[in-house]
Amino acid sequence: MKASFLKKIWIIIVTVTSTLWICLLVFYLRLTRTYNREYADSVLRWWSGVLLREVGASWEVSDTHNVTIKPGRPHIIMANHRSYFDIPLSFVSLPGSIRMLAKKELFKVPIWGQGMKAAEFISIDRHDLDQALKDLAEARQIMQSGIVLWVAPEGTRSRTGRLGDFKKGGFMLALQTGAIIIPVGIQGSETILPPDTFDFVLGRKVEVNIGEPVDASLYNIEQRDALMQKVRQAIEGLAGEEK
């Protein structure tokens, strides 16, 4: 069922106010040196639940491999990206202290940008190679501290519902850190909010499928393309895109 005009306005108000609140909260915790990662995790999951409840979404998680986060090993979640709702769905469905690798432009948004940085999200500069390398070095450090990095290997949301071409950055990071890649396929998130619209659809059901982890430490730099292909095939299957 499509949301009415008033419901759309309400969803937008709740989204903006709850997002501003958690950004200010995390920023305050940083300023007062009382930041706690586990508490930040719980706040992000609370925020995600609020957004999903407002659109009446339900979700089912399939984890046939019983994926867990191995202490002492870097982890990268690589997921298809069809909707803004992939982010809250990931927070409520996937294991670990998840943070996103996001384009630098988002960090320039007042309050939101400061909140993301305070909560240990990582920016990536898509247009400046030297800065991108510095960003990836920062990502390596934060992964070593226990953060599970969420990456959309396409680099952006799909407007067609199909996987686009993969970018190399996330895979280079996985190879450099010997990370465990957790492939994830999200089915149905685009039906909640179609691309480039505010036409919310209420009561949709989404599937979050967690695949078999891929150990990037078993690959070398010359095998990068093989690693990319393996992960791509996994995500295609999990996202229901198998040919």
How does the language model describe each region?
Residues 2-6, 133-243:
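Non-catalytic C-terminal accessory region of glycerolipid acyltransferases
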Residues 1-30, 42, 67-69, 222-243:
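Membrane-interfacial terminal anchoring regions of lipid-handling membrane enzymes
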Residues 56-58, 97, 118, 146, ...:
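A generic structural signal for alpha->beta connector loops
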Residues 65-71, 138-141:
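Short amphipathic alpha-helix with an adjacent loop that forms part of the alpha/beta core around
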Residues 61, 77, 100-101, 208-210:
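Generic preference for hydrophobic
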Residues 19-22, 26-34, 38-42, 53-54, ...:
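Catalytic core of membrane glycerolipid acyltransferases/transacylases, capturing the structured
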Residues 48-57:
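A generic, lipid-embedded transmembrane alpha helix
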Residues 49, 88, 171-172:
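Active-site phosphate/pyrophosphate- and oxyanion-stabilizing loops and adjacent acidic/basic residues
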